[in-house]
């Protein structure tokens, strides 16, 4: 792996997906909670408090970050479907990772399971026109739901790979 920050490569560029590409990414999004949880299964507190790379977040912080990030993406999905080009709010992900609810990872893993069931149910129901709906991010600009699906599929796999790579590297 050449860059430990991006074990599966960089985030995808803005794109329009075909029906087949959407179905493939939806399957990945549906499977993510189980795969993500398996990457954290059986880890001790000391292991969870280990950064996945020098200067990076701990595995514990990654577990909470993915739940927080995907929760925000779910809300952005619903905003894009119910409002005309809504401007979404950013959040301070580094500060969220330090809040008192970030000790035990089980609640975040539970949240991810239920969240992904609901999120995938919404996404599976979309028409081609709805996939083109847009929300506006203050930093990245306009994002279609296609772009959002591609990004968050990558995001989940990206952080799962961080955990799996550290486990392999340390023999856990």
Curated annotation (Swiss-Prot):
GO CC annotation: cytoplasm
For the keyword Glycoprotein, the answer is no
Mind telling me which Gene3D superfamilies this protein's record contains?
dinb family like domain
Q: List the disulfide bonds.
A: none
Keywords of this entry: Cytoplasm, Hydrolase, Metal-binding, Zinc
Source organism superkingdom? Bacteria
**GO function term, MF aspect, one:** zinc ion binding
Q: What is its EC number?
A: 3.-.-.-
Keyword ATP-binding: yes or no? no
Main localization, broad class: cytoplasm
Q: Where in the cell is it found?
A: Cytoplasm
* Cofactor: how bound: Binds 1 zinc ion per subunit.
Residues involved in Zn(2+) binding: 65, 155, 159
So which cofactors does this thing need? Zn(2+)
Enumerate the Pfam families for this protein.
Answer: DinB_2 (PF12867)
Family to which the UniProt record says this protein belongs: Belongs to the metal hydrolase YfiT family.
Tell me, how does this one assemble?
Homodimer.
What does the UniProt record say this protein does? Possible metal-dependent hydrolase.
- What NCBIfam families does the record tag this protein with? PRK13291.1
The name on file for this protein is Putative metal-dependent hydrolase DR_0841
| Annotated source species | Deinococcus radiodurans (strain ATCC 13939 / DSM 20539 / JCM 16871 / CCUG 27074 / LMG 4051 / NBRC 15346 / NCIMB 9279 / VKM B-1422 / R1)
- Give the source lineage, highest ranks first: Bacteria, Thermotogati, Deinococcota, Deinococci, Deinococcales
